[in-house]
């Protein structure tokens, strides 16, 4: 793989909250940037409704100090720096608020992203007119796991896009289940649960060791939200977690719900719109001219 072989390519990923860029697309974004592509992550909210892992900053949550969104800006930009990509907040930081899950009282907040309407579409159109991406990455119609903000990110991306290829970040069920079966020991308090995945994908992008390590570090930057069970600790979460997996080159992680899952060695995509992927494609830009 040659450095700068993607020079001239422009890619925009539209994500709902800080940490989504790392979890769902961190490997691909890091690889694109390392190979010379111009990569921008547009984040639509500050993730104010998130829970917090660890006691250090637990009182930042919405029900207490309601300062989590501001804190997560710093986590986001640490992650983006690790990935080597640019970051933009849709409408400016704080324009749109995390809507929470369906039924959350946060759904009724006047700045909740689910109420963003045509204004958010126009904001994204203006950014895309400036950035001129060859490729857009976001989620599928269900947002990946049903979060209203993820669904809204999908909606505004398709509404604002021109004729660019749009890829939806998904999880391949077979690889996910193989990774889950390989986990033979869980940290104390962690468990197993249902995880969202799809039965078929249009593209699987393999993450080499360097890219995989970069993705893991970008995820680690979101320490209030993600816990990686490799014995590491941080100021945010000084408690180490250890998982046992039969896949030596795969790490195990969890959100605040402590449902264990593998950080898979591939990132998976479905074609949402635009130029089809050529047969045998191995990269998100395959078949595009730039």
Swiss-Prot record:
Cofactor requirement? Zn(2+)
Q: How is the cofactor bound?
A: Binds 1 zinc ion per subunit.
So what does this thing catalyse? Answer: 1D-myo-inositol 2-acetamido-2-deoxy-alpha-D-glucopyranoside + H2O = 1D-myo-inositol 2-amino-2-deoxy-alpha-D-glucopyranoside + acetate
Query: GO MF terms on file?
Result: N-acetylglucosaminylinositol deacetylase activity; zinc ion binding
Q: Where does Zn(2+) bind?
A: 17, 20, 150
User: Which keywords belong to this entry?
Assistant: Hydrolase, Metal-binding, Zinc
Q: What does this protein do?
A: Catalyzes the deacetylation of 1D-myo-inositol 2-acetamido-2-deoxy-alpha-D-glucopyranoside (GlcNAc-Ins) in the mycothiol biosynthesis pathway.
Q: Cite the HAMAP family for this sequence.
A: MshB (MF_01696)
PANTHER family per record? 1D-MYO-INOSITOL 2-ACETAMIDO-2-DEOXY-ALPHA-D-GLUCOPYRANOSIDE DEACETYLASE, N-ACETYLGLUCOSAMINYL-PHOSPHATIDYLINOSITOL DE-N-ACETYLASE-RELATED
**By what name is this protein known?**
1D-myo-inositol 2-acetamido-2-deoxy-alpha-D-glucopyranoside deacetylase
Q: Which organism is it from?
A: Corynebacterium glutamicum (strain ATCC 13032 / DSM 20300 / JCM 1318 / BCRC 11384 / CCUG 27702 / LMG 3730 / NBRC 12168 / NCIMB 10025 / NRRL B-2784 / 534)
**Biological classification of the source:** Bacteria, Bacillati, Actinomycetota, Actinomycetes, Mycobacteriales
